[in-house]
C-alpha cells in the first residue's frame, strides 16, 4: 500500500439517486489515485453528500456535516442541500466547499485543493464497473437526472433541474460492466423512469451492432438480455407503462413496479398536480395482474396534504382496499421550503396527520398480510443478501433492498450473498416471509 496516497471519506445521505452520485464521485477520485477511507480519523478530507428534500432531511444533513467537522474538520459538502449554501455555512462556517447536486467536477476540484492527489501509474486502481457503495451482488443504475413535472409538494426540478437522459448505449454499457463484475440485480432509478429519453426525442444509439431507442420499453428489453434481475423504480404511470408488463410476464425483467401514486382523491391529486384518473388506474392494475399474475406493485402515498378532508382520506382507504398493492410506504405531509403547496389553504393539523397515517398503515398491513399469506406453500426464487451463523436472509422478486420485506432461511448457512435459489415458503407475517431451500432432502 502506498502510504503517500490521499484518503477520502464519504457520507452519503438520502435516496438511491444520491448514492449513485456518491459512487460516481468516488470512481473518479479512485481513478486519480485516492483511497476510500471507512473512518473519519483516516481520511484526509470528508465528502458529505446531503439530502435537502424535506426539513427533516436538511436537519439530518446538517447533523452529519457537524459530525464530520467534529471528527475530521476537513469537509466538502455536496448534494441537494448544497443549493442552500448560506444555511450550510451559517451552521458550519468551517466547511471547505459547498456544491449542489450532480456537480461532480466541482466536488473533485475541491478534493484536489484540500488533498492534492498522489499518482501511482503502476496500479490499476479502478475496477471496470466503478466504485460502488452497495453490496457486490446488486447495484443501482441511474438512467437520467432531473424531472419535468411540477408536483406542488416537490422541489426536485429546482434542486436537480429538468430531465436529462443518458443515451441508451451508455446505460447499457454500464449495465453490462456491472453484470460482468458479478452484479446479479440491477435497480433502475431516476426521478421519472417512465420519461426516460423524452428529452432525447427517444433517439437511437448503437449497442452491439444494433440501434436502441432511448425509451423505457426498448431499454428494458435490452437490459433483459443481460441474464440478471432488472427491477424498475420511480415509474410514473404513463399509459405506455402497459408495454412493460409483457416483458415481465416473459421473465425479461422482474415482475415489480414501483409507482408513486401519492393519493386517490381526485381533488387532492389535482392539488398535487398529479394524474387524477384513479378509477382507470384500478382497471390498469387488473389488466397488469391478468397479463402477469406474479407482478408485485409498490407505491408511496402522502396523507395530510393541505385541503385533505376526512372524505378525501376515506377515498384513499377505499381505493387501497380495491387496489390491494403489495408494498406501500406512507408519509405525513411536510411543507418543503420553496414548494408551491405551501401556498395552499386548509392545512391539516399535525395530530390529524398522525391519526390518518396510523389508520392508513393499519389498513395496508392487513392487505400485505393477506397477500403474503397466499405465498405460503409455494416455491419462489429468492436472491440472498446476508448469511451468518443463524442462516440466510434474502428477498423475492417482489422485494427491493432496504424498502421492502425480507425472506428468512433459518439454518441455511451454506449460501452466499448473490446466490439465487428456489425457496419453499413456510410462513408469512405482515411484511416478511420464512422458508427453506426447495428440493432439499
From Swiss-Prot:
<keyword id="KW-0004">4Fe-4S</keyword>
<feature type="binding site">
    <location>
        <position position="15"/>
    </location>
    <ligand>
        <name>[4Fe-4S] cluster 1</name>
    </ligand>
</feature>
<dbReference type="InterPro" id="IPR012340">
    <property type="entry name" value="NA-bd_OB-fold"/>
</dbReference>
<feature type="binding site">
    <location>
        <position position="147"/>
    </location>
    <ligand>
        <name>[4Fe-4S] cluster 2</name>
    </ligand>
</feature>
<dbReference type="GO" id="GO:0051539">
    <property type="term" value="F:4 iron, 4 sulfur cluster binding"/>
</dbReference>
<dbReference type="InterPro" id="IPR006638">
    <property type="entry name" value="Elp3/MiaA/NifB-like_rSAM"/>
</dbReference>
<dbReference type="GO" id="GO:0006400">
    <property type="term" value="P:tRNA modification"/>
</dbReference>
<dbReference type="InterPro" id="IPR005839">
    <property type="entry name" value="Methylthiotransferase"/>
</dbReference>
<keyword id="KW-0408">Iron</keyword>
<comment type="similarity">
    <text>Belongs to the methylthiotransferase family. RimO subfamily.</text>
</comment>
<feature type="domain" description="MTTase N-terminal">
    <location>
        <begin position="6"/>
        <end position="116"/>
    </location>
</feature>
<keyword id="KW-0949">S-adenosyl-L-methionine</keyword>
<dbReference type="InterPro" id="IPR023404">
    <property type="entry name" value="rSAM_horseshoe"/>
</dbReference>
<protein>
    <recommendedName>
        <fullName>Ribosomal protein uS12 methylthiotransferase RimO</fullName>
        <ecNumber>2.8.4.4</ecNumber>
    </recommendedName>
</protein>
<dbReference type="GO" id="GO:0035599">
    <property type="term" value="F:aspartic acid methylthiotransferase activity"/>
</dbReference>
<dbReference type="InterPro" id="IPR007197">
    <property type="entry name" value="rSAM"/>
</dbReference>
<dbReference type="GO" id="GO:0103039">
    <property type="term" value="F:protein methylthiotransferase activity"/>
</dbReference>
<dbReference type="Pfam" id="PF00919">
    <property type="entry name" value="UPF0004"/>
</dbReference>
<comment type="function">
    <text>Catalyzes the methylthiolation of an aspartic acid residue of ribosomal protein uS12.</text>
</comment>
<dbReference type="InterPro" id="IPR038135">
    <property type="entry name" value="Methylthiotransferase_N_sf"/>
</dbReference>
<dbReference type="Pfam" id="PF04055">
    <property type="entry name" value="Radical_SAM"/>
</dbReference>
<dbReference type="GO" id="GO:0005829">
    <property type="term" value="C:cytosol"/>
</dbReference>
<dbReference type="InterPro" id="IPR013848">
    <property type="entry name" value="Methylthiotransferase_N"/>
</dbReference>
<keyword id="KW-0411">Iron-sulfur</keyword>
<dbReference type="GO" id="GO:0046872">
    <property type="term" value="F:metal ion binding"/>
</dbReference>
<keyword id="KW-0479">Metal-binding</keyword>
<feature type="binding site">
    <location>
        <position position="80"/>
    </location>
    <ligand>
        <name>[4Fe-4S] cluster 1</name>
    </ligand>
</feature>
<dbReference type="InterPro" id="IPR005840">
    <property type="entry name" value="Ribosomal_uS12_MeSTrfase_RimO"/>
</dbReference>
<keyword id="KW-0808">Transferase</keyword>
<feature type="binding site">
    <location>
        <position position="154"/>
    </location>
    <ligand>
        <name>[4Fe-4S] cluster 2</name>
    </ligand>
</feature>
<feature type="domain" description="TRAM">
    <location>
        <begin position="373"/>
        <end position="439"/>
    </location>
</feature>
<dbReference type="Pfam" id="PF18693">
    <property type="entry name" value="TRAM_2"/>
</dbReference>
<feature type="domain" description="Radical SAM core">
    <location>
        <begin position="133"/>
        <end position="370"/>
    </location>
</feature>
<keyword id="KW-0963">Cytoplasm</keyword>
<feature type="binding site">
    <location>
        <position position="51"/>
    </location>
    <ligand>
        <name>[4Fe-4S] cluster 1</name>
    </ligand>
</feature>
<dbReference type="InterPro" id="IPR002792">
    <property type="entry name" value="TRAM_dom"/>
</dbReference>
<dbReference type="InterPro" id="IPR020612">
    <property type="entry name" value="Methylthiotransferase_CS"/>
</dbReference>
<feature type="binding site">
    <location>
        <position position="151"/>
    </location>
    <ligand>
        <name>[4Fe-4S] cluster 2</name>
    </ligand>
</feature>
